[in-house]
Amino acid sequence: KATIFCADSSYPILAKHGIKPDYVLSLERIPLTSEFFNNDFGEFDKDILFVLKSYVHPHTTKYLQKNNRNFMLVSTYASFIQYLKLDYFGYFNMGKSVANMSYLLTEYLNYKNIILIGQDLAYAKDGFSHTKDYKNLDKHEGHFQRDKGKFQCLAYGGNGKVESSEIWTMFRLIFENDINYFQKFFNITTYNCTEGGARIEGTIEKPFLWACENLLDKDLNKPFEKLE
């Protein structure tokens, strides 16, 4: 009943729980991010389209090709890339994070109701930066202590403040700009169903269960037809 756009880091987590995304996106150029694709989930990967920024780390495409996963490379509006005259393949803006990239792709595919899940963009009360089954959790040790008190912002629901980081603050501000722009000019409604973390201005905050019961009322014919 929903189209699922999944960030690279969430892909192995969704696979672990048997939740199949329609699109998995990635834009990082570091080998650490490529490791999210160093796996073989077999039949689970059938009909998933992996959408990659055109200059991801080479290991990303190597791992995807190894298991014959279906992927495409897309480019942003960078001057150098446009000078190469690959206009036939098209471009789209991607923002600074894979979450921003996913959000922009939903707009280009003309979705009108967008549900955000897992976009905390803030530390949890226990200081953790990601879910406990996030693969690279150890890489963020000490970050909460480093950022505490420096990047506080309004909490989800409007009750009090939460601790954030410089990068998350940047991602949130980009989100807010895109959300308000698409609402104003394209009548796109964005729901934040994260149920925690930072408030993302311009979204409608609702529990995820509410979104499932009120927005997901039509079965979708998957896999989707290929666009020309």
Question: What is each stretch, according to the model?
Answer:
Residues 1-228:
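Metal-ion/cofactor- or nucleotide/acyl-coenzyme-handling active-site neighborhoods
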